[in-house]
Amino acid sequence: MKIENGVAKKYRKSVDDALDAIIAQGNDDHKRVTKLILDSKMLIQVKPVSEVKASGVTGVISPWRTRGKLDEPMGLKEALGEIYICIAEETIDTGGQRGCEGTLVHEGRHAYDFAQMIESLSEADINPLKVFDPTLYELELAAHKTAGEYMLCVNRGEYINEGLDLGILGKEATGQCFVSDDGIKLRLKTNYSVTHDGDQGRLASEIVGLR
């Protein structure tokens, strides 16, 4: 992983600390994805929210360059090197470490799924039936679920409260919290206008400009 030149020291430290925390506190999937990112040449950017337009966003650094590489099989780690995650400065300024961790867990899942998509497209001539190209609904469902699972792993007040406020987590009558499939699906319908049995949105390859 590499952090873009020019990113302020405090943001670099926040990103490094967040990735360390995810490995220390997350489940096996969180650890696996984060370690893959750290071992790759994936790019991390930090920019004002006026440019990012969200707490974080994930995409392909250069779609035309990546398209040119799809003629040859590409491994997952190499594919991650085609990806960037951009975090809004305000995510760290106002959300602190929790905000940075949560964004990296969510966007890290997108980065992993985009890399899987790129890897599968590069092998499409060999394995045309194994192309992985999820819809926006599938991408966001996976990212929201992994974010909810991380909140439960950390199991501290501010993390749990954020999950409950966002509808990602639910609470049993006993007080036990859980990842809420219904809450996440409602959030996807409200915020992204996608549903399981209706419009699932564009394919990952279309979202990042590879098709």
Where are these regions (language model features)?
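Active-site scaffold of zinc-dependent metalloenzymes
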Residues: 57-101
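Extracytoplasmic/secreted proteins, especially bacterial periplasmic and envelope-associated proteins
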Residues: 10, 14-17, 32, 99, ...
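A metal-dependent hydrolase signature that marks the N-terminal structural subdomain at the beginning
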Residues: 1-69
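Post-HEXXH active-site segment of zinc metalloproteases
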Residues: 98, 102, 114-141
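Short active-site segment of divalent metal-dependent hydrolases/proteases
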Residues: 105, 109, 113
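Second-shell loop/turn segments in exported
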Residues: 2-7, 19, 90-94, 98-99, ...
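Long, well-structured alpha-helical subdomains associated
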Residues: 136, 148-211
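Residue-level detector of alpha-helical secondary structure
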Residues: 12, 16-23, 34, 38, ...
